[in-house]
Amino acid sequence: MKEYLDVVDENGMPTGETVERSIAHREGFPHRTSHLWLVRKRDGRIQVLLQKRAMTKSFPGCYDISSAGHIPAGQDYYPSAIRELKEELGLTAKESELIPCGDMKIVWDDVFFGIPYHDRQYTKVLLLWADIEEDQLTLQKEEVDGVLWIDLQECMDRVAAGTIQNCISPEVLKLVQAAAAATA
């Protein structure tokens, strides 16, 4: 089944045009995504849940956002984030539980499996407090190879140093850190 996305303008607002997801990435059409970060507190420190991307996905085998996804045409950020959370990790949440961290524009050019990839995302970064263990999650095997709770500051340090295989933006982690500290 083909997935269609709203093409957005320089402010991240839908233009009325839609495009198939694969074409959006091949041609670099700007579109919307949601990034939902799960956090918890352990021993007085904030931890973040990372998902390890499936080997068949873009950025194969990399640690990434707890749950993320493209916003289907005609839909909005929050319902999409909740849907992706259920699909990828088997968790449910209410929109009122999602804490906005900020908005970002992400530009990324790469090649995956021999195919050019031009990503132009307008992203809403969200946070969800989730006092759960890894074995309480139901992973979507087509998308996620595993998960890892990690101290947020350690994650930030390792991403900055390049000592963890990841596709995480350090700027996004700063947004998550600020929102987590403000709501802890």
Predicted regions and their residues:
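Nudix hydrolase/Nudix homology domain
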Residues: S22, G61, S67, A73, ...
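Short secondary-structure junction motifs
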Residues: R45, P60, A93-E95, E134
